[in-house]
Amino acid sequence: MKYLPFISRFDKLWLSRMGWHTKQRYIIFESDDWGAIRMSSKSSLDKIRNLGYQVNRNKYESNDCLESGEDLSRLLEVLIKFKDECGNNPIITANFVMSNPDFEKIRAQQFSNYYSEPFYRTYERYWSNNNVSTIIEQGINSTLFYPQFHAREHFNVFSWMKALRNNTYGMRTLFDLGCVGTHINELGGNDYVRAYNARTRNELDFIEKSIEDGLRLFYKIFGFQSKTAIAPNYLWNKCLNRTYRKEGVEMLQGSYRQIESEYSKHNKISHYLGERSNGIFYSVRNCIFEPCQMGGNKAVQRCLYDINNAFRLGRPAIICSHRVNYIGSINPKNAINGLDSLNILLEQIC
C-alpha cells in the first residue's frame, strides 16, 4: 500500500475527527457514473488505439462502458447473497448521469448546438435485448440498488462542443465512433470529464440550468426526488449548493477535498462529515474500493484497512466504488475481477 505524505495524512486525520460521530458500524457503498457513455464499444476502443490515442493509460477509457443488463444482473447476484446481522442485503447507492449526447442531432446541426437524450434511450440504442431499465427496477424493489443524482451529463459541454467545431485532437473521428472525448492528457486523465468546470459566468449559468434539468429528469424517470448528489470529479462552484437545495437535494456526497471552480482558477476546500452549508449537509467518502484501478487483492485489503480506520474514529465507512469495476462489455475479465473482489470484500464484512 502506498502511504500518503505526512502532511496529507495528518490533514485527513484532522478532518476525520471533526463532525458527526457514531458508535454504530455503518457501511455505505457509493458508486458513480451509471447511465453514462464512456467508451462506446470494444470495436471503437480497438479503432481508437490504432489511431494512436493512448487510451491504455486510463483504466476508465479502456474498460468503462454503458452498463448492460448482464452487468447489472451479475452485480445484483453478488449483493443478494449477503446479509448483515439485521437481515439487510448490501445496497449500492448508484449515482446516475441522466443523459448522453444525441450524436445524430448534433451532427445534423453541424456541431452548432448541443442535444441530448435520456440514458434509457441510450440503453435502447445500445442493447438489442434492452432489459436494463427492468433490472434497475428489480434492484430498487429488492433494496439492492438505489439511484441518486450524479449529473445531467458527465462531460464539459462547452469544451467538448468547441473541440468538435474545431476538430481538436481529431475529435470528430472520436465523435463518429460514439465517444465523448478520449483525449488523454499527460497525467492519464480525460480532459473533458469535468462537467462543472465553468470558465465564464455564461458557462456557470449553463451548469446551474443543467443541474435543475437533471434533477427534474431524475424525478420523472425514477418517480422520487434524489436527496443526495455528487458533482463529477468533486469539482463544482459552491454557489451551486443553492441550486441543489432548491431542487430538493439535502446532502452532497463527496471527498475530503472539493475542487472549487472559479472561472480561471481552482481552489481546494476541505469538508468533513456532517458539515452544513447553504442548507446542504456534506457526506465524506473515507474508504476506497476500486479493483479496476488497483487490482483485486490490493483493493480488498485497502478497503478493509479504510473500514477499520473509519470505525476506529467513530465514523461510518463510506466506500467509493465506481461503475467501471463491474462492467464487462469491453473487457470481460474486468467485470470478473471486480465482482470476485466484491464477493471477497463482502465475505469479510458481512
Task: List each language-model region with its residue ranges.
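A conserved mid-domain beta-alpha-beta active-site/ligand-binding segment of alpha/beta enzyme cores
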Residues: 287-288, 292-294
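Short, glycine-/Ser/Thr-/acidic-enriched flexible segments
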Residues: 324
